[in-house]
A protein has these predicted regions:
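Residue-level preference for long, well-ordered alpha-helices that form the structural scaffold
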Residues: 1, 5-8, 83
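Short, contiguous alpha-helical
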Residues: 6-21, 25-72, 112-172
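Helix-adjacent hinge/juxtasegments
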Residues: 63-104
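A mid-sequence interfacial segment
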Residues: 91-126
Length: 172
């Protein structure tokens, strides 16, 4: 068996779902919790993880996961009940990112605020993983800063994912 980025992407997808499940157990006001910047509150961060993954998926594959380029982003998270929709959207975009691990590692022509750039597909896929990890940590910090039960990051580590995938017959 070869070591692949697909397993890291599967971990990312699982950890995203576990984070959303945890948020669904918290009171409504937890969605407005923030660590240091009130513009980056829990609901905004969770939305940002999935919305960014939607954009990464399109950039990597050229296929639309949820939103067309130029269309409005996915809907904001206003209440705990909106997290069920976010979980479905995360499942869609994360599945597309996992599938992209089988594509050739080619240079992609992309645009950002600074203009046109080129990045290897593997770089964008790796950044998608890093981005989600970084912001799940941000969510945990925001919850803890405002006195809500944070997700215990060790519970969504690769160590715990390996236990989960082994118990569920998901190993390659």
């Amino acid at each position: 068996m070869s070591i692949t980025v697909a397993r890291l992407l599967r971990h990312m997808a699982w950890a995203n779902q576990e984070t959303i499940k945890h948020l669904q157990t918290l009171p409504e006001e937890s969605l407005k919790a923030y660590a240091t910047n009130p513009e980056w509150f829990v609901a905004e961060i969770a939305h940002h993880i999935v919305d960014s993954a939607d954009h990464y998926a399109y950039e990597i594959t050229g296929n639309v996961a949820i939103t067309q380029p130029g269309d409005p982003c996915i809907a904001d998270i206003e209440s705990i009940s909106d997290l069920a929709r976010l979980a479905k959207q995360a499942g869609i975009v994360d599945a597309q990112l996992i599938g992209a691990a089988d594509l050739d590692d080619v240079w992609l022509d992309l645009k950002n605020d600074g203009g046109k750039i080129q990045r290897l597909r593997s770089t964008v896929l790796s950044q998608a993983i890093h981005h989600a990890t970084e912001h799940r940590t941000h969510i945990a910090s925001a919850l803890e800063a405002k006195g809500f039960e944070p997700i215990f990051l060790d519970d969504i580590s690769l160590w715990d994912y390996e236990i989960y995938e082994t118990a569920n017959g998901l190993r390659d």
